[in-house]
Amino acid sequence: FAATAGAQDTKVAIGISGWTGFAPLTLAKEAGIFKKNGLDVSIKKIPQKDRHLAIASGDIQCAATTVETYIVWNANGVPITQLVQLDKSFGADGLAVRGNVAKIADLKGKTIGVDAPGTAPYFGLAWILKKNGMTMKDVTVATMSPQAAATAFIAGQNDAAMTYEPYLSGV
């Protein structure tokens, strides 16, 4: 990727969300690391559920997302290759619940704000429910972005919110 004298920078648009783990991309842009290496990078905030559409349309050339999302996209005909793993998350995701939910089984029949199928929050919620003898059919899903799920939960909407940092600590 090293830039050559007089060469024009290669334009690259990267789609990200507000998830903390994607911050190194913005930091690299702001620090001039991409530019120094011959890349003219633009960072676009695009919800995870829409990033595959932005890739397919050519609006972006790269997408920062989770590993399971790459698998889903490939399975659905979006030919992509994972280039790098930015980080490993051990605790940035979480399920916020109201005071009347003492155990996961108490979520049966409740409404949970969670991102679309194929996203990390959706996968996380499905995993939590499965580990507790439940499925997604046992709850009512209100599909919304992780930020919107946290905001709706704070506003008193929904019984729970599956989200991640930086939104999780606000609920």
Name each model-derived stretch.
Residues 2-4:
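N-terminal signal peptide c-region/cleavage motif recognized by signal peptidases
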Residues 7-148, 152, 157-169:
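Short, glycine-/small- and polar/acidic-enriched structural segments
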